[in-house]
Amino acid sequence: MAIDPIQLNPELAKWLETRQNALKIVKTTTTPSGQTIDWVPIESQHPGGEVATPPPAELAVADQSQDPQQPVSPVTFELDDPKVERGPAGTVPILRPDISRLTRRVSLDEFLTKQGGAIVNKARRNAQPTDPDPAGYFHNSDSQDGTFYGWDGILSVWDPKINTPDGDGSDHSILQVWLQNYDKPHLQSVEGGWTVDESLNGDDKPHIFTYYTVNGYTQDDDNKGGYNRVHDGWKQHSGSVFPGIRVGPSSVFGGTQRDISMKFKLHKQESGKVNWWVAVQGIWMGYYPANLFDGGLGDHVDWIGVGGEVYSSMGIPEHTKDQMGSGHRAADGWRKAAFMRNLRNQVNMNATMVNNDGTATSNVATPGGADPYTIQMHMISGGAWGSYFYVGGQAR
């Protein structure tokens, strides 16, 4: 989409120019929905051109067990269509951030920042007085402490309404996983799921995202933290699925349910190097080098959170009508509320997976304020969905 230089914050325009100049782009394409993709040689992302080896393909697949009484269909991706233009062999897709909708009111920091993970687990042991304490965030999640080396699960996909009744365009609604480590003075986190976020994605549809921070959400920058491949850190591997890709179709209230699988795995290759690999729909999408974390999350996970996050930009966040999941509360259940199912934690470096057995937690945008969102847990259910829950709220 064309960018209006009069409307845009000059700081944002300069940042994007610098980012683009740092990529070794050999071809640029546009998807049917209008996303701009820059294709770069896969080895250009790596010092010395050394490309990491992914885990075995069979380990990319999450538990696909289904209940025949609750049929679910997978979402699709635009690059699944062989007719969609791609880059040449040996290149991988890097999404170009769409800043065309952003006005001069939106600063570079506002565009880049994601701080909700700083408060999603208020009981963490390494909390610091100087930690970010962002306003406007609501969470309803499944929380589990322990020592872990990965996670997988399946997320239902919806198109929640945001920026209602009068958000400033920076609101978001997310279903995701947080993998956090507390060994360092600053919280470290690797995250992923799907998000509806107009300022990040340029539209109001669900997109896959990844995020990481090595410094407790205090600064997003190259090799420090950030969404997708907005900053350096993420290494793209797949030629068809990438952070920021649009997904669809979404679930229909009372009708066809759609979902997507994700997997995070701390993997040590034969060379001894360790990386955080991320798979989507059974495809190894890419990874975060574990050395970004200087120990800490590069060794193990201390806490796994799975659930929903809503951010409202309103001065009184409790007045928001932003939706989480389907927009319906957890008690509405099958075909009405969003779910996350077949939730499993990796408990050793040998890829052993066990059912998640967390507890329900929530926090609100203002201490003592109302919580319009709910979660209903069914851990180790004994059924085809294993450990699962329904989550959401702010009915349509």
Over which residues does each language-model region extend?
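Exposed, interaction-prone regions of secreted/extracellular proteins
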Residues: 1-396
